[in-house]
Design a protein with these regions (language model features):
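Outer-membrane beta-barrel porins/channels
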Residues: 1-173
């Protein structure tokens, strides 16, 4: 088997998930969810199941990721709802992670993303045929950016924030 033909050779980690939600008075829905994914236990294998050479990097630099989500939606009127949510995801890489670039890769940079926080707010309309949704999403996280593959190169500290406004319009047939 040609190991270079392996499209996605990373076997994903095991995950643990628990969630709970309820409705209050038929007008408000609330929910919370926790998920743990052990990315450090992922396996890099070729098509025949043999471990690839980068496996020690997976075990050394990837770690367990905690994700916590909480949200609510309230019906303001029979056709209108408002919602809000929060999402926290811990970093997947260890602090000392760096990119040991393979020979077949042409990019030189590596961005070690830290814990990520996301806030969302939305307003929705649901008619008999037409529905519409307007949502705002704000992501904020820090990262260590490495311009080149050099373990002694100090990271550039980057503060990242992203604002998104998303509008969806649809019709039911």
């Amino acid at each position: 088997s040609n190991y270079l033909t392996c499209g996605d050779c990373m076997n994903p980690p095991w995950k643990f998930n628990v969630r709970r939600g309820t409705t209050l008075g038929g007008l408000v829905a609330v929910g919370a969810e926790y998920e743990y994914a052990d990315y450090g236990s992922s396996k890099l294998e070729d098509m025949d199941g043999y471990e690839l050479g980068d496996q020690p990097s997976v075990e050394s630099f990837l770690k367990g990721v905690h994700t916590f989500r909480v949200g609510m939606e309230a019906r303001l009127a029979p056709q209108f709802s408002v919602r809000a949510g929060y999402n926290y995801t811990s970093a997947a890489f260890t602090e000392d992670a760096y990119s040991a670039l393979p020979l077949y890769r042409t990019s030189t940079d590596f961005n070690n993303i830290k814990d990520k926080n996301t806030l969302t707010f939305g307003l929705g309309y649901r008619g008999n045929v037409v529905y519409a949704d307007l949502a705002y999403k704000y992501d904020v996280y820090q990262s260590d950016f490495y311009a080149f593959d050099d373990i002694d190169l100090p990271a550039t500290k980057v503060d990242n924030s992203r604002n998104q406004l998303v509008f969806t319009l649809g019709a039911r047939f």
